[in-house]
Amino acid sequence: MKLCIIYHSETGNTRHVAQHIASPFNANLIEVCDTASYFQLTRFLVRCKMARSEEKTTIAPASLDVSGYDLIVFGSPVWAFKSTPVIHAAIDELKGCMGKPAVAFSTHGGRPGQTDETFKNWIEDRGMVPVAVTNIHQNDIENEKKIKELVALVHASIKV
């Protein structure tokens, strides 16, 4: 079974979790980055507003072909109780995703808000099948038990 983990990470928390999930499966890791330029003083506010409104931004890589994968995993930090505009754009630009099973996780420092529901909707809108959606608090990203639970969730999704 071939896995692909597509994630966006600003502080490294989501990257850290994605790497831990990828390791036992030898999954391909694809980090998606925001290519839009923002005024430094308002960068945080503008991007949180975009997340809240479920907007998308310009990204690199601009599109991803996932036709060669059996399971797609998405990872995003939580901004203003939603997934980021970066991961939204990545999901929207996927090629070869129709009918594929997908797992999504988010990392957060407070509360996940509507992130799980938003992820599920975006995945379904692109014709994929959401088999698991979860989140992990930043205090738990070094917690071996929590990481093992995420890995087990992905492993269970392979059997779906």
List where the protein language model places each region:
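Accessory recognition modules or surfaces
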Residues: 90-92, 109-112, 142-151
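A glycine-biased structural micro-motif
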Residues: 98-99
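N-terminal beta1-alpha1-beta2 submodule of the flavodoxin-like/Rossmannoid cofactor-binding fold
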Residues: 1-75, 81-93, 128, 135, ...
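Short, glycine-/small-residue-rich phosphate/pyrophosphate-handling segment
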Residues: 103-137
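Alpha-helix N-cap/loop-to-helix initiation residues
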Residues: 10-14, 80, 111-112, 140-143
